[in-house]
Amino acid sequence: TNPTSSTMFKSLISVKSRNPIIFGFHPGAQKCSAAAAKIVLDAAVAAGAPENCIQWIEYPSIEATNALMNHPGVATVLATGGSGMVKAAYSTGKPALGVGPGNVPCYIHKSADLEQAVNDLILSKTFDNGMICASEQAAIVDKAIATKFEKLMKKYGCYFAKPDEIKKLSDYCIDSEKGAVNPVIVGKPATWIAEQAGVKVPEGTKILLAKLDGVGPEYPLSREKLSPVLAYFIVDSTEEGIDRAEEMVMFHGMGHSAVIHANDEDVIQKYAATMKASRLIVNSPSSHGAIGDIYNTNMPSLTLGCGSYGGNSVSGNVTTVNLINQKRVAKRRVNMQWFK
């Protein structure tokens, strides 16, 4: 998940909290991740940091990562990746800050500012070509505004796949045996993905949308896709929209994030109360809203906890304070006398 930005962020919060950090990168992102780590390392050393404050495994493997996590010199594990790796981190017996996958629904209610909602959706879904785990995975749109939504999306360079093209995209983008995204599409442009899947799209296409009838294993594109590929649902009512969003979150996105575009406060509150998500993003781009600070006052972070919903120890945005031990010297004082 967003390997370069995640590497830089973890390096920064570690150095800021006076902790050295050693990375075990995913083999598929080794080169770009190592390059990102070296940029931060060189800058840190130039500013006076210790020479080996940021390190990484040169030849990555599952065995090497497990050895690193279980090494007696490692105090805490920051686990970002698949559920298997996160579970392995929790099984080390060390404090572990694991984060989970997202399957983020974007419900666009009929009360929304549609122009802004479309702009936010495209901005978020194209950022880093959809690699951020908080990026929208499905647009859920009220029927009353669906036609206008489609016109605006097409106007700004998005492509709605035909039924036969949806099948091609499903077969190419999702590994049916593993029930997960095909790793080769992660972070790739929409035009490249379409070409590889055998779908002809206009030059400059930003996002590929696939209209689906449901959520679950029988609808492969309702999964997390980490690319500019977006599931699309039209719903007849607010209740159906919230239910469909809940289905998305429950389908391998528990505890992560959900976004809503609406100007009806009652709808926003009902949506927030229903979603089993740690971050509820309102009238903002999901990627940037979940990362925090730009569109809200959430703590800026690229390590997003999913809480007990997602099997994580934290539900917030992991940052420097999570890597600091606090000592509390408690001297005898006359405190409030609650009982005699």
Question: Across the structure, where does each feature detected by a protein language model lie?
Answer:
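Conserved small-residue-rich beta-alpha loop and adjacent elements
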Residues: 1-41, 47, 75, 83, ...
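ALDH superfamily catalytic-core signature
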Residues: 8-9, 13-20, 86-216, 338-339
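Solvent-exposed alpha-helices and their adjacent loops that cap or buttress functional pockets
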Residues: 15, 46-50, 68-72, 78, ...
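Buried hydrophobic positions in well-ordered alpha/beta secondary-structure cores of metabolic enzymes
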Residues: 18, 54, 77-78, 102, ...
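Short hydrophobic alpha-helical runs that function as membrane-insertion/retention elements
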Residues: 20-24, 78, 97-99, 107, ...
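A glycine-rich helix N-cap at a beta->alpha junction
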Residues: 41-56, 279-281, 286, 291
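A structured beta-alpha segment of the ubiquitous adenosine-cofactor-binding alpha/beta core
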Residues: 55-74
